[in-house]
């Protein structure tokens, strides 16, 4: 991670966004030549974390644990678990987020204190991504009357703020449990005329046309060859803007992901795919879109690249 980024920048001006982030977190990486100053959480903490969660380490600690990757076979473990629920990644993700994953992530995305320190940190990171997304969407225009597709809406953490700003929101998720939770929360916070339209659906099956399509922290479930097609599909639904967030692929993050796979648990049936910004930009370019704004959210245990794309 050879950077200490601001949370949001644009291709035209970086500084214009910085005053809007008084609490922006800058992530400074410990040089490899120094002893580790960022230590992994306890195994007790990590046991409750998904394969999408990476234990952040430094220096020799990373090298030592990275060597352990060859002693385990997380891919074989995932394959066996996948066979139990019918095969491919989509079925695994659907099953996971309708069962143990739903309970875990409902706590992380909620306000309960029944989470460990790693999960609290992830909660903070995802909340920052939602905040930064809302800033991208409202920086230079009102959302009143704007049609927005929230693809992979989870428990409604973005859908509800969008509706509060006057957007006409269509929200979907592969998990029926997540959609039910999002709908319940929306009804408690919004008047009936402003409620998003919720549906259970996977990304591949989404149809329609929207001013803006948003897909946050979902591409982590897609390998790059499938992510290219998914990005193209999402762009085909959008008229003006596409906003995506994804776990950035770097050598350091890739090692940390592999370390995270060493810790057993039911969530390891779900694969966690990292994506390079260049690959995402290339996929957008192939279908006539270009990146207009870029952002990055980082906490100790959460990192997510955020981009806004517009037609060329």
Swiss-Prot record:
Give the disruption phenotype, in one or two sentences.
Lethal under normal growth conditions and stunted albino plants unable to produce seeds when grown in presence of sucrose.
| Expression triggers | Up-regulated by light. Down-regulated by the herbicide R-imazethapyr.
Gene (UniProt): CHLM
User: In its UniProt entry, what is this protein called?
Assistant: Magnesium protoporphyrin IX methyltransferase, chloroplastic
* Function text: Converts Mg-protoporphyrin IX to Mg-protoporphyrin IX methylester using S-adenosyl-L-methionine as a cofactor. Involved in chloroplast-to-nucleus signaling by acting as a negative effector of nuclear photosynthetic gene expression.
Matching Gene3D superfamilies, A to Z? Vaccinia Virus protein VP39
Q: Which family does it belong to?
A: Belongs to the class I-like SAM-binding methyltransferase superfamily. Magnesium protoporphyrin O-methyltransferase family.
- Sorted alphabetically, which InterPro entries does this protein's record hold? Mg_prot_MeTrfase, Mg_prot_MeTrfase_C, SAM-dependent_MTases_sf
Protein keywords: Chlorophyll biosynthesis, Chloroplast, Membrane, Methyltransferase, Plastid, S-adenosyl-L-methionine, Thylakoid, Transferase, Transit peptide
Reaction catalyzed: Mg-protoporphyrin IX + S-adenosyl-L-methionine = Mg-protoporphyrin IX 13-monomethyl ester + S-adenosyl-L-homocysteine
Q: Name one GO cellular component term.
A: chloroplast membrane
Pathway where it operates: Porphyrin-containing compound metabolism; chlorophyll biosynthesis
According to the UniProt entry, how is activity regulated?
A: Regulated by the folate status via an increased concentration of S-adenosyl-homocysteine (AdoHcy), a potent inhibitor of most AdoMet-dependent methyltransferases.
Q: Taxonomically, what lineage is the organism?
A: Eukaryota, Viridiplantae, Streptophyta, Embryophyta, Tracheophyta
Q: Where in the cell is it found?
A: Plastid, Chloroplast membrane; Plastid, Chloroplast thylakoid membrane
Broad class of where this protein is predominantly found: plastid
Topological category with respect to the lipid bilayer: Peripheral membrane protein
Give GO terms for biological process: chlorophyll biosynthetic process; methylation
Instruction: Write one Gene Ontology MF term.
Output: magnesium protoporphyrin IX methyltransferase activity
What Enzyme Commission number(s) appear in the record? Answer: 2.1.1.11
First and last residues of the transit peptide: 1-39
What is this enzyme's class at the first EC digit?
transferase
């Amino acid at each position: 991670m050879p950077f200490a980024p601001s949370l949001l920048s644009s291709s035209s001006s970086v500084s214009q966004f910085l005053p809007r982030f008084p609490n922006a977190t800058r992530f400074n990486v410990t040089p490899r030549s120094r002893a580790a100053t960022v230590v992994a959480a306890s195994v007790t903490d990590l046991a409750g974390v998904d394969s999408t969660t990476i234990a952040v380490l430094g220096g020799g600690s990373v090298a030592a644990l990275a060597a352990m990757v060859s002693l385990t076979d997380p891919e074989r473990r995932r394959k066996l678990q996948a066979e139990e629920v019918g095969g491919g990644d989509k079925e695994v993700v659907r099953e996971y987020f309708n069962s143990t994953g739903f309970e875990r992530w409902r706590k992380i995305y909620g306000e309960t204190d029944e989470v460990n320190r790693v999960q609290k940190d992830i909660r903070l990171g995802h909340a920052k991504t939602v905040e930064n997304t809302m800033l991208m969407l409202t920086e230079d225009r009102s959302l009143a009357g704007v049609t927005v597709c929230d693809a992979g809406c989870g428990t409604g953490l973005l859908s509800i703020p969008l509706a509060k700003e006057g957007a006409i929101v269509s929200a979907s998720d592969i998990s029926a449990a997540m959609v039910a939770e999002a709908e319940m929360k929306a009804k408690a916070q919004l008047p009936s005329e402003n409620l998003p339209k919720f549906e259970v659906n996977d990304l591949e099956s989404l149809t329609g046309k929207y001013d803006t399509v948003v897909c946050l922290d979902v591409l982590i479930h897609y390998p790059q060859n499938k992510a290219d097609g998914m990005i193209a599909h999402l762009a085909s639904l959008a008229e003006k803007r596409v906003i995506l967030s994804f776990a950035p692929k770097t050598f350091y993050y890739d090692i940390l992901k592999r370390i995270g796979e060493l810790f057993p648990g039911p969530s390891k049936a779900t694969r966690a795919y990292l994506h390079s910004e260049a690959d995402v930009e290339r996929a957008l370019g192939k279908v006539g879109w270009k990146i207009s704004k870029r952002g990055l959210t980082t906490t100790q245990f959460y990192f997510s690249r955020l981009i806004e794309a517009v037609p060329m």
